[in-house]
From Swiss-Prot:
Gene that this sequence comes from: tpx
Reaction(s) catalysed (UniProt annotation): a hydroperoxide + [thioredoxin]-dithiol = an alcohol + [thioredoxin]-disulfide + H2O
SUPFAM superfamilies: Thioredoxin-like
GO molecular function: thioredoxin peroxidase activity
Protein name per its UniProtKB record: Thiol peroxidase
Enzyme Commission no: 1.11.1.24
Length: 169
């Protein structure tokens, strides 16, 4: 059966595998706002938080990114990346407008590698962009936490994310 999330109550199908806690986190190449490639996933010397959002130009994604920027401000030993399909130029403008400095904002426009995380929307008005989700990857490169937000227009559970990150760092 196809995996779905809802857009204003209507189901949309997701493309790619369903990652579960304990799975190896695939490496994915994204492009930062400064046009540099960054690899997310896999084993690293820090805990990784990979946040996928549909577009920074929407109110919920804007709020979510600003909130994670604020929440992660004092955390050491964690690398946070917010990934959308927005072009890096728009992401740079967004980061400058809202003083986003504590998370990396990156785009999946070049390789569509986030399909490896099963969050690419495969149909409907949002086909080709990313669903709202949060993945926490431990230092060994294993998925430690997954939150696929069931309704695209809603924010994730921030407290769950923070608690899991604190547990791992």
């Amino acid at each position: 059966m196809a995996r779905t999330v809802n857009l204003k109550g209507n189901p949309v199908t997701l493309v790619g595998p369903e990652l579960k806690v304990g799975d190896r986190a695939p490496e994915a190449v994204v492009v930062t706002k400064d046009l540099q490639e960054k690899i997310v996933g896999g084993a690293k010397d820090v805990v990784q938080v990979i946040i996928t959002v549909p577009s920074l130009d929407t109110p919920v994604c804007e709020t979510e990114t600003k909130k994670f920027n604020e929440i992660m401000a004092g955390m050491e030993g964690v690398d946070v990346t917010v990934v959308s399909m927005d072009l890096p130029f728009a992401q740079k403008r967004f980061c400058e407008s809202f003083n986003i400095q504590n998370v990396t904002v990156a785009s999946d426009f070049r390789y569509r590698d986030m399909e490896k995380y099963g969050v690419l929307i495969g149909e409907g008005a949002l086909k080709g962009i990313l669903a709202r989700a949060v993945f926490i990857i431990d230092k060994e490169g294993k998925v430690a936490y997954v939150q696929l937000v069931p309704e695209i227009t809603e924010e994730p559970n921030y407290d769950e994310v923070v608690n899991k990150v604190k547990e791992l760092i």
